[in-house]
């Protein structure tokens, strides 16, 4: 049973002989194995399965590496007003449903939900696992996410997508750190999300993300105007999804 992956095994201890001591040792080993399994599962829930797997394989040293990634940022509109107008319990229910949909859609497109920030979520494609089609996956996820979130009553959102080089790795102090991505694509996606809240479709992407996407995915996007996003020197050329019939 253990060989088949069944860790819920306990042998009966018959006596205090050598065989009995071996039986006690086996049971203790299986208890520790079960505890490690639970810890791995909890670790994966907190940081994501890919990050947990990477940490177990390569360790948790601080530092990062340059990766080509696509970043998707999604944020609720008017969350402050929502929190003041609804009972706290209702707000928690709304947030949990919002994040559940976000995780489901991002997982479907093989992305990594890096963090929840209040009423927003940051998703990464291309780290910690390489993805040559990261922009394609992020753009497709953005389109699907917009429609999936439409089903949640009382929820309005903005979604931004960008792509480019960023530093991905364990950032923080030795005592406390997190796996995250830092760089221009993250900043641009965040600013695009702010602007998307003011646009009818609620979804915006940089044309750099669209440029690196597959031909099939590009057909779902329309190129638009150039804008000066807050905190950025160069202009960002916008793109948004083609309206579905």
List each model region and its residues.
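The cytosolic transmitter module of two-component sensor histidine kinases
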Residues: 15-22, 65, 91, 135, ...
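Hydrophobic alpha-helical membrane-association signature
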Residues: 91-98, 137-141, 145, 185-188
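Cytosolic regulatory/linker segments at or just downstream of nucleotide-handling modules
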Residues: 166, 189, 195-245
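HAMP signal relay modules and closely related sensory coiled-coil linkers
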Residues: 1-2, 6-29, 36-37, 41, ...
């Amino acid at each position: 049973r253990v060989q088949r992956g069944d860790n819920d095994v306990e042998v009966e201890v018959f006596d205090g002989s050598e065989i009995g001591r071996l039986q006690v040792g086996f049971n203790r080993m299986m208890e520790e194995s079960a505890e490690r399994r639970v810890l791995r599962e909890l670790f994966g829930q907190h940081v994501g399965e890919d990050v947990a797997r990477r940490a177990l394989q390569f360790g948790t040293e601080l530092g990062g590496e340059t990766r080509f990634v696509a970043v998707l940022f999604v944020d609720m509109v008017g969350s402050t007003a929502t929190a003041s107008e609804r009972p706290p319990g209702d707000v928690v229910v709304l947030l949990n449903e919002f994040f559940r949909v976000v995780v489901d859609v991002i997982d479907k497109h093989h992305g990594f939900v890096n963090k929840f920030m209040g009423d927003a979520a940051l998703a990464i494609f291309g780290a910690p696992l390489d993805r040559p089609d990261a922009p394609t996956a992020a753009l497709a996820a953005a389109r699907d996410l917009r429609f999936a979130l439409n089903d949640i009553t009382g929820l309005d959102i903005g979604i931004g997508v960008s792509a480019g080089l960023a530093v991905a790795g364990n950032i923080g102090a030795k005592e406390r750190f997190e796996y995250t991505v830092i760089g221009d694509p993250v900043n641009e996606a965040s600013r695009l999300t702010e602007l998307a809240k003011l646009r009818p479709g609620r979804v915006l992407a940089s044309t750099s993300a669209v440029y690196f996407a597959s031909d099939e995915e590009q057909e779902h996007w329309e190129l638009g105007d150039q804008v000066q996003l807050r905190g950025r020197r160069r202009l960002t050329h916008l793109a948004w999804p083609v309206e579905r019939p």
